[in-house]
Amino acid sequence: MSELQQVRNAKGDRIAIVMGLRTPFAKQATAFHGVSALDMGKMVVNELLSRSELDPKEIEQLVYGQVVQMPAAPNIAREIVLGTGMNVSTDAYSVTRACATSFQSTVNVAESIMTGNIEIGIAGGADSSSVLPIGVSKKLAHALVDLNKARSFGQKWAIIRRLGLKDLLPVPPAVAEYSTGLSMGQTAEQMAKTYNISRADQDALAHRSHTLATETWDSGHLRDEVMVAHVPPYKSFIDRDNNIRENSSLDSYAKLRPAFDRKHGSVTAANSTPLTDGASAVLLMSESRAKALGYEPIGYIKSYAFSAIDVWQDMLMGPSYATPLALKRAGMELEDLTLIEMHEAFAAQTLANMQMFASKKFAKEKLGRDRAIGEIDMTKFNVLGGSLAYGHPFAATGTRLITQVCRELKRRGGGTGLATACAAGGLGAAMIVEVE
């Protein structure tokens, strides 16, 4: 029995990535301050439909994701359908897989096309770190429920007297893993120590990322995949990612103090991704439908895989587990790839995964493989810069990676590319695309 993944529908059509688009990515509380993930999602989907010149009513399914949930609009996908002119009957649902969320939404739409349920769909994700669901303490939440049930003034006063001043303080969304209490930064620090990754190497990777991203923007390569976003009340706009250090100097990175282990650490704000706002989306179709409508797809999905490992130690190793699965399902080896796009959540996490790609010991002990995944050729790796420079709106990063690798392959004349990411919860995602 063949181990190759058949990413096709019953007619033999491949799954076409017709077009991809994103907003510029903005640091927390800057250009998108006050703009919700839902509003950014509607913004990018509207623009995607406009650029594709596709009637919104042709969309049969929309799967969209968000990591930092909005209690007021928990099904972001449905709200996007209602706010972008699609049929009210359009199938829409929301997903979340931490930083791999829009990998998941893309796969869900692709699988709907593979089964023949639909021929046209949109996938993507959005997150805002500027519009946050600020909560209340557990004690206050408990008291508010009790107050709702209380009838007399005496009952209500007794409930109020249970509360102290600290119980009234707002509670921001958790930045730590629910099961371990560890933040992503603490995990990156773990990985730096486990794999002996130096501060100098982390800073060098961050400097490379910012330098390449600056060159990419200056060359104009991103203009067709990043929209101009006009921000309510429409007196300003953003047309470029604002986290990129356009005059990055390697010497300047050494000036920052460690952020998560003040005494012995090496992970800093400069070699980590910042909290970021943004949205992205891709338009997917069956190959025959795309060609019948006159589109030239930017790529096709060849294979995909997800992985999960333990969360207590070095949990951001997802690319090292998901990538070999995707390669096997595509019938490929790492050296067969034309380009590699790996999410750079932290320089330490990225370098740890790169190190384990080349490790025979890791391959044998963790993956059950006879050979290493392969040593990464840096001339193929994150050639336009990565998340350290562009930023990381959690749910939007997956479709940013997929679009970026497809468009760069197209610009170079075609080939195959890998997009891969780690994610909270010990999760990983990988997708191989082919471009003609």
Swiss-Prot record:
CDD domains, per database record: thiolase
Family, similarity comment: Belongs to the thiolase-like superfamily. Thiolase family.
Chief location category: cytoplasm
The reaction(s) this protein catalyses: an acyl-CoA + acetyl-CoA = a 3-oxoacyl-CoA + CoA
Biological process terms in GO annotation: fatty acid beta-oxidation
Gene: fadI
Enzyme active site: 99, 392, 422
Compartments in which it is found: Cytoplasm
Swiss-Prot/TrEMBL keywords: Acyltransferase, Cytoplasm, Fatty acid metabolism, Lipid degradation, Lipid metabolism, Transferase
Main function: Catalyzes the final step of fatty acid oxidation in which acetyl-CoA is released and the CoA ester of a fatty acid two carbons shorter is formed.
Listed name of the protein: 3-ketoacyl-CoA thiolase
Pathway membership, UniProt: Lipid metabolism; fatty acid beta-oxidation
Gene Ontology molecular function, alphabetical: acetyl-CoA C-acyltransferase activity
Classification via InterPro entries: Ac-CoA_C-AcTrfase_FadI, Thiolase, Thiolase-like, Thiolase_AS, Thiolase_C, Thiolase_CS, Thiolase_N
EC number: 2.3.1.16
PANTHER family per UniProt: ACETYL-COA ACETYLTRANSFERASE, CYTOSOLIC, ACETYL-COA C-ACYLTRANSFERASE
Subunit annotation: Heterotetramer of two alpha chains (FadJ) and two beta chains (FadI).
GO cellular component, one term: cytosol
